[in-house]
Amino acid sequence: MSSPVPGLMLPEKRVVEVRNLSVYFEQQGQRTDAVRNLTFSVDRGETLAIVGESGSGKSVTSLALMRLVEHAGGVIHQGDMLFRRRDGQVLDLRGARQRVMRTLRGADLAMIFQEPMTSLNPVFPVGEQIAESIRLHQRMDRRAARAETLRMLDLVRIPEARNVLDRYPHQLSGGMRQRVMIAMALSCKPSLLIADEPTTALDVTIQAQILQLIRVLQREMDMAVIFITHDMGVVAEVAERVLVMHRGESVEAASVGQIFAAPQHPYTQGLLAAVPALGSMRGQPFPAKFPLLDQNTARIVDNVPQDTVPAHAEPILQVSNLVTRFPIRSGLLNRVTRQVHAVEKVSFDLWPGETLSLVGESGCGKSTTGRALLQLVESQKGDITFDGQRIHQLKGAALQHLRRDIQLIFQDPYASLDPRLTVGFSIMEPLLVHNVCRRQEAEKRVAWLLSRVGLEPEHARRYPHEFSGGQRQRVCIARALALNPKVVIADEAVSALDVSIQAQIINLMLELQREFGIAFLFISHDMAVVERISHRVAVMYMGQIVEIGPRQDVFERPQHPYTRKLMSAVPVADPSRRQREQVLLVDEIPSPIRAIGDEPTTAPLVQVGKRHFVAHHPIAGAY
C-alpha cells in the first residue's frame, strides 16, 4: 500500500483536486492534445458535471483520473491529481504506481461506464462479478461476499434481487444492467464515483430511475460524484457545479444555477440553445426548427414554423391491424413453443409532408413496426397500403421498386455504412442498383446531395471513419434521399448524437420535408425531440398503440397514464424546476414473450378529441 506523500494538502472536505492536467495521444508520429491545462475540484457530497460534445476531452479526463488513459495510448504529461482516500490520506494519482492504482480502483475510486453490456463479463453471472470486487477489496469470504452482493442489489432497487444474482448480463434489460454496474461501483463505498454518460442510451423512465438512485446513494454514503454527460437536462437534474469543456479545454465553470441562468461563453450558450426542452412548443401547431446559436458569435438563427401537409391530401401510407411475432424454438425437436409478441394490431395513417412519431421504451415494438413496412421482418397479419397499392405481400421486382419510395435511416450511422466504400459510392449505390441514371449523372447527384445535407462535394472521396458521428448521419440522410423517396423511416436517427449535432440534423430533416414534401415516420424514445419535429404522435406500449393524436393534444393534454409517465420522466434543462424526489419506480416492462395460444389482451382506441384516440384499459406497469 502507498503511504501519504509529504507536502500534499487538501481542504478538509475536498476529495479530489486536479491542477493544470494535460493529456495527449501520439499516433504515427502525430501528437493530439486531448486535454489542456484543466483545473477543477470536487468536495465530499458534491456533484460536479463535466459537459461537452464528443471529442471535448471529458471522458479522457475521467480515464486520466482512473489512470486508465495509459492503456488507451494516452500520456499524462503535465499536472497534479490530488485525491483523498477513505482513510484520509492524500496522494497524487499521477505519480501513483499501477500496483497502488489497482488497490484504489473499485475501492476508493469507482467508475460507471456508458455501456454496461460491454463493461460486464458475458460469461459470469452478475452476482459473481460484484462479489469478486468485494472479496478483492474487503477481504471477505465467499459466503459473506455473496450476502453483501445481495444487499447491494437491494440497495440499487433491483426487484427480486436474489433471483438476479445468478443471471447473466444478456438476461437483464438495459436499466437492470446499469443498476448492476452501479451496485458494483458502490460495493466498496468509494470516496469518488465517476459516472461517464451512464444514462445516454437508456429510455427516459429508466434514466429518471438511475439519476434518482445515484442521488439517493450519494447522500447515504456522503460521496463525491463526477458526472460526465452531453445532456444539459441531466446536468440540471443532478449537479451542484458545472465544468464546460470544448476541444480539450475548460471554457466555463460555475454553479449550476449560474450556468443555466447566465452562461458567459458562446459555446455554453450554444449548448443550452440546442437543448430540446419539453414544453417549448406549447401553443404551436406545427413542427419548428431549433433556434440555433452560432457557438462562435452567440448570434441566434431562427425560423417561422409552417405547415407542410397539403390540404385535402390522401394518406400516402395506411397501416391496419399489423401483427408481427417472432417464434422461439426449444426442446428436443426444436419446435416453436413461445412467441415474442412484438407488434399487436397496430393501425395508423401517414400523410404526405407529415411527421408521425412512434414513441415508447425499448422493446415496445416501434422499430419492428418500421421494419415491417419494408418487409425487413415478416408480419403475420394486417394490411399495409402505400400510395393506393397494397404492399404487405409484395415480392421480387415489385418489392425492390417499393424500396425506392420508402427509405430507412438507422440509429447507428457507422454500422449502416460499409467501411470499405467511400461515402460517395455508398450514396451512389442505390442510384446504380435501381438503374435511375448513369454513373456520370450519379456522381453529379452525389455532389448535390452532399451539399444539400451540409457537407462538401469533395467529401465523397472519404471513408466513413474519417467523419464525426453527426457528419456520418448526414451521409446516411443523403443516401436515403438519393432516390427521391416519398416516405423516410428514421429509426432513432438522432438519439446517439450530441445535442447541437442533434439539433442540426432535426433542422435539416425539417428543411428537406419543406422542400421535397417527404413524409417521415420518426421512431424515438426522446420525448423532447419528438415534440419539436412531429405533426402527430403515436405512443406504443407492449406492441400496442395506447394513444395517438396531434402532437399538441398528446403533449399538452395526454390522456393515457403511460403517456403521462413518459412525459414526467423527461429531465428538464432548468435547475430551478429540478424534480422533487418521487418513489423510485422499479417495475420492468413485462415480457412480450408468451406461450403458443396465449393471446394478449388488446383494446380498441376510443376517440377523445379531433383525431385524438386513446386505449381505455388498464395495462400492467403503465399506471
From Swiss-Prot:
SUPFAM superfamilies: P-loop containing nucleoside triphosphate hydrolases (SSF52540). Its EC number is 7.4.2.10. ATP binds at residues 52-59, 360-367. One of its GO terms (cellular component) is plasma membrane. One of its GO terms (molecular function) is ATP hydrolysis activity. GO terms for biological process: peptide transport; transmembrane transport. Part of the ABC transporter complex GsiABCD involved in glutathione import. Responsible for energy coupling to the transport system. The complex is composed of two ATP-binding proteins (GsiA), two transmembrane proteins (GsiC and GsiD) and a solute-binding protein (GsiB). NCBIfam families: oligo_HPY, PRK10419.1, PRK11308.1. This is Glutathione import ATP-binding protein GsiA. It comes from Pectobacterium atrosepticum (strain SCRI 1043 / ATCC BAA-672) (Erwinia carotovora subsp. atroseptica). The lineage of its organism: Bacteria, Pseudomonadati, Pseudomonadota, Gammaproteobacteria, Enterobacterales.
